């Protein structure tokens, strides 16, 4: 007996193509002249757009390396160091 039929679950959908619909790609499926694509990516489904963001390297999304994400500790005031420490600590009330 097939377990999927018993629970009436659908199989997992295929993964979205990685960066296949970014502007400038010759094989771009969603780039037709005058189409209403989401933010110029050629992706009409918001879930596809979100999937593409998850696949981008961190520098492409944030524009900074991991070490520069919160700035240098030397350039901050004592108050901001305390805020960062409280934000990222594992303590919960």
From Swiss-Prot:
<comment type="subunit">
    <text>Efficient DNA binding requires dimerization with another bHLH protein. Binds DNA as a heterodimer with MAX.</text>
</comment>
<comment type="function">
    <text>May function as a transcription factor.</text>
</comment>
<dbReference type="GO" id="GO:0005634">
    <property type="term" value="C:nucleus"/>
</dbReference>
<keyword id="KW-0539">Nucleus</keyword>
<dbReference type="Pfam" id="PF01056">
    <property type="entry name" value="Myc_N"/>
</dbReference>
<keyword id="KW-0238">DNA-binding</keyword>
<dbReference type="InterPro" id="IPR012682">
    <property type="entry name" value="Tscrpt_reg_Myc_N"/>
</dbReference>
<protein>
    <recommendedName>
        <fullName>N-myc protein</fullName>
    </recommendedName>
</protein>
<dbReference type="InterPro" id="IPR050433">
    <property type="entry name" value="Myc_transcription_factors"/>
</dbReference>
<dbReference type="GO" id="GO:0003700">
    <property type="term" value="F:DNA-binding transcription factor activity"/>
</dbReference>
<dbReference type="GO" id="GO:0003677">
    <property type="term" value="F:DNA binding"/>
</dbReference>
